[in-house]
């Protein structure tokens, strides 16, 4: 119920916020007019006139749609990717798509360019309970529902702890079962995401790990069918949430496949006057289309602002620097003690996909950490037309490796220059005599600097960067190691 209370509170604030300042009921004229951010509103004998009624309802629906856009971001990322999986790659819902190169990952929100991804999007209503075989070895990942809430980690940060095993995932309405030899979990949603990374730096060993990932129905466990692995190579695709009316068309479709959870009931009620209702087709009127289209644009700008200008207390990593913790959720289920982390959730799921315990980077030497910046040392937005420099000090606090990646601030995918969009400590990069590394960013290679240390950007495009720590060590947690800001080269 705490989630319902939160949404109720948000809705109340929205609905009373027409004026620049708060307006009490007694301040409304019995007969007369007053200015608001949506124009002049008029009352006659305490009632809104016809023009005011129309304005108020339009604004109610518009404001609700903007907030619903933010609410739906994690769900719509999954729906979009599942659709691309089926239509662009000709993969079945129980097939894995293996994203091995940076070109394969060009449509993926804030992907890392270093390790292979292996992804599937099963529908448990269609298959019944599913078995997922995880091979022994260095893998990371797990399973989430379609709201991107973790069902369980697998691999090194999962219950198998890197030893491999069989995971049995039940759907929302499947009967309980606990067969011996399986890690058993239940998904709150019908559609799920099976997401894994092969972490072995040896390419042959990584391929063997990928081949060891299997999916099949529990009902066919005695004679399981072979798992198909599909390559996305050479196919253009996009995991970016749809824009405009397509966002709402996708939302209307997916909510008709999924159960409504308690925390979402209030938002579902807010969507009903906009023509989006479970159990009914989405046939919006011209008025609804206009409001939804505008709200999708404004909602995305809200998400972009929340993501790139983070105002979360404690998200800044080092005083005076512009590096923030990108995945700034207290818990993987997106809940804080007294509220759902609505803005933090919007920030992360606008930029990225997936949450797991391992991605929170809270255990010394294990998991990953995601540090982010969209600004240079002077606080200016990063521009693809400018040249920049970053010094990575020696002894980076990682048990495995670090990487720096550049992303397009509109698509949140790799800056698509046709060349590798990242550099990592695994690469053949030039180090300084003191062990530090100088990296360069810009539309052209820096004169007199090692090209191996340069990441290309696109003129006229904004970009942001993730600095990833794989297996963060104590020097990060005690902040004794400090990453400088990216500096513009003048």
What is the meaning of each model-derived region?
Residues 8-19:
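Bacterial N-terminal signal peptides
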Residues 23-490:
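A compositional/structural signature for long, glycine/proline-rich flexible linkers
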Residues 1-7:
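N-terminal secretory signal peptides that target proteins for export/translocation
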